Design a protein with these regions (language model features):
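A short glycine-rich, His/Asp/Glu-containing loop-to-beta-strand
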Residues: 85-106
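Long, contiguous binding/interaction regions
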Residues: 101, 128, 144, 153, ...
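Short, conserved beta-strand element in jelly-roll/cupin
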Residues: 103, 114-130
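Short beta-strand His + acidic residue motifs that chelate non-heme Fe in jelly-roll/DSBH
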Residues: 110-113, 130-132, 141, 150-162
Length: 170
C-alpha cells in the first residue's frame, strides 16, 4: 500500500519517460548523477542492453553505456515520498545504480535482451498475466512487498499479458 501511495505521489509530479519514443518502454528515474537532472531523461532512463534482434542470432548493443555507480543523488522532487525511505534502506544494504519506476502497459513486452548487471525488483502493481522470463525460467513476481534479485545479465524479458498496468521499482 505504501508503495502504491508513493507511486500516486510521484505521478502527480512527473510523467513516465519513454526514452525518446521507444515503444513499450516507460520509466521514472528516482535518482540521478549529482547535479545533473538530465541524467534522468531520454536514453538515460533506459541505458545499455544487448539483444539478438533477428534470425541470424548475432548479439548487438543498443543504447548508451552508463556508469550506474554515478547515480547517487535522490531526485529532490520525490524526497517527500515513501520511495525516499525505500531508497535509503536499500542503499544501506546494496550497492545501487539507477533506481527507476518501470511501467509495462497491458498486453506489452520487452525485447529478449540482457543487461550489464543484476537488478532488484520490487513489484508495486501487478496482475497474474505479468511474467518475467530469465533464460528458460518464467516467474510471476507478486506485489507483496518482497524484493526480488534478478540475474538480468542473462537473457530475459518481461511481459504483461494482463489488462492492468505492471509497475516495478527496479
Amino acid at each position: 500500500k505504501k508503495l502504491q501511495e508513493g507511486l500516486k505521489q510521484v505521478l502527480r509530479l512527473k510523467n513516465y519517460d519513454n526514452a525518446n519514443g521507444i515503444k513499450n518502454f516507460a520509466a521514472i528515474c528516482l535518482n540521478q548523477i549529482p547535479g545533473k537532472p538530465e541524467s534522468t531523461k531520454g536514453n538515460f532512463a533506459r541505458g545499455v542492453y544487448w539483444t539478438k534482434p533477428d534470425h541470424f542470432g548475432n548479439e548487438v548493443t543498443r543504447d548508451k553505456i552508463l556508469d550506474e555507480t554515478l547515480y547517487t543523488e535522490f531526485v529532490k522532487d520525490f524526497e517527500h515520498t515513501y520511495f525516499k525511505e525505500v531508497y535509503s534502506k536499500l542503499s544501506s544494504k546494496f550497492k545501487l545504480g539507477r533506481v527507476r519506476i518501470l511501467l509495462k502497459e497491458p498486453r506489452s513486452t520487452l525485447s529478449w535482451h540482457r543487461d550489464p548487471e543484476p537488478r532488484l525488483h520490487i513489484p508495486i502493481i501487478t496482475n497474474p498475466g505479468c511474467i518475467m522470463v530469465i533464460e528458460k525460467v518464467a516467474k510471476h513476481l507478486p506485489a507483496d512487498g518482497s524484493v526480488y534479485i534478478t540475474n538480468n545479465v542473462k537473457y530475459h524479458n518481461a511481459f504483461n499479458g494482463g489488462e492492468e498496468n505492471r509497475v516495478h521499482l527496479v
